[in-house]
């Protein structure tokens, strides 16, 4: 529940509250993955992006990857790939394209829009730079949703760093 409140804090611009959750309640034992805390790990990665720490994002998400793949956690996998793509993009690592393509392929297969659009302007420059050859009608709906999210979110997670 606290992780959800942290996400709300980020979206409403209360970054001090998000940082407090990170310091006091974010999972710390990344070497001993607790799959029941996957929402918390994803939230932790969001706060790390918010704080401008893309390297830490990758360390946080890496233990989740085998579980998500082996158990076919589609939505979690989309979030993991989008967050990883944003982190790689901010590090100027071209592997972001592979991660975003994987996220878009999965999201398009299930017609998920919100799972990607929630990242607003954090993902917008990636989407604009990626030549994705998937469903064009779905991508058009996705881009509209991403732009809408970008217009209403206050979080710095949505601000790309240069």
Regions found by a protein language model. Name each.
Residues 1-12, 39-51, 79-90, 121-129:
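Tandem amphipathic alpha-helical repeat scaffolds
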Residues 19-30, 62-69, 104-111:
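Amphipathic alpha-helical segments of tetratricopeptide repeats
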Residues 93-151:
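General nucleic-acid-binding
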Residues 155-161:
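Conserved small/polar residues in nucleotide/adenosyl-binding loops
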Residues 15, 54, 93-94:
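TPR-repeat structural position
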């Amino acid at each position: 529940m606290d992780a959800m409140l942290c996400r709300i804090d980020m979206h409403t611009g209360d970054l001090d509250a998000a940082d407090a959750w990170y310091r006091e309640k974010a999972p710390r034992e990344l070497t001993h993955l607790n799959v029941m805390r996957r929402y918390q790990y994803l939230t932790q990665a969001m706060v790390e992006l918010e704080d401008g720490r893309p390297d830490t994002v990758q360390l946080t998400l890496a233990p989740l990857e085998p579980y998500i793949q082996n158990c076919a956690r589609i939505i979690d996998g989309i979030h993991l790939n989008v967050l990883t793509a944003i982190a790689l993009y901010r590090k100027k690592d071209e592997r972001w394209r592979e991660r975003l393509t994987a996220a878009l392929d999965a999201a398009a297969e299930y017609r998920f829009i919100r799972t990607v659009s929630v990242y607003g302007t954090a993902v917008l420059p990636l989407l604009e730079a990626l030549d994705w050859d998937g469903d064009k009608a779905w991508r058009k709906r996705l881009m509209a949703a991403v732009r809408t999210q970008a217009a209403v979110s206050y979080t710095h997670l949505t601000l790309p760093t240069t």
